[in-house]
Amino acid sequence: MNPISLASGVVPEFGPLDTIKAAVAGGFDAVGLWIEPPVWTPQLTRDVKRALADSGLPLLDVEVIWIKPQSDMSEHKRCIDIGVELGAKNVLCVSSDPDLSATAARLAELCVHAEGGGIRVALEFGVFTEVKTIGMARAVLDAVEHPLRALLIDPIHVDRSGATAADVAAVPPALLPYAQFCDAPAERPDPQDFNAVIIDAIDLRMQLGEGRLPLHAMLRALPRDIPLAIELRSKALREAYPDACERALVTGRATRAWLRSAERQAS
């Protein structure tokens, strides 16, 4: 069964220490954390390192580096530095810079900064960004030409951008250190309606098997046993389970049940 990580988006109203506790309570194999460099302190780094050590959970990823036309690269690099100090395996990046050559240049700069840190720089595509499709993302990464570059697949963004599992299967496995996973309704928001796109991404995701995304095909298209960050941003889930640990437990159980079912179907 694929290792599963509690993505920070499942518990967005909670800080990193509570997120780690929730990942433990939910029976996850790893955890992801949201990093805010302007308010992140050395004491918080020490506290998070201690909490991770006590939990025994690896830190699958930290997020988010959001590349913009006037990006403060020093702040982005600090996000990487914090991730490296915490032992993160990946840092998640998105871009709202319409100049894709500039995005590639900044990603390359971040990859160089990450050298020796044991961390990959993963670009996520989606219609809410300027890297809207898997093809655009691959073109950016081809321009980066650095071994630490990576591509982050999220089924909802694959579907909403009009891509398919076949497009995912065509990605070189070396570019896929991990993936996000969730389900979602069949109805796609109008890609020109930014608010609808954002609501779809942060409020309307669903437990695996409860929506209409082709998750079995998507899982088969990904490298075998790839770690899955369960990115279940759901208003309904937040309202039904205001406690972070309970929310993580429900999500972890549903995820493992679906993965067991997927394994049976594949055998």
Predicted regions and their residues:
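Acidic-and-aromatic substrate-binding clefts and catalytic sites of carbohydrate-active enzymes
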Residues: 9-16, 33-44, 66-74, 96-103, ...
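Active-site acidic/histidine proton-transfer and metal-coordination neighborhood
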Residues: 17, 67-151, 160
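N-terminal pre-domain/capping segments
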Residues: 1-89, 146, 150, 181, ...
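Alpha-helix-loop-beta-strand connector modules within alpha/beta enzyme cores
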Residues: 45-65, 108-122, 143-144, 213-220
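Acidic/histidine-rich catalytic cores of soluble enzymes
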Residues: 30-31, 112-212
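A short, acidic, flexible beta-alpha connecting loop/helix-capping segment that sits on the rim
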Residues: 11, 227-246
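Charged helix-capping and loop-helix junction motifs
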Residues: 43-50, 73-80, 103-111, 134-139, ...
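Generic structural signal for hydrophobic
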Residues: 22-23, 52, 83, 110, ...
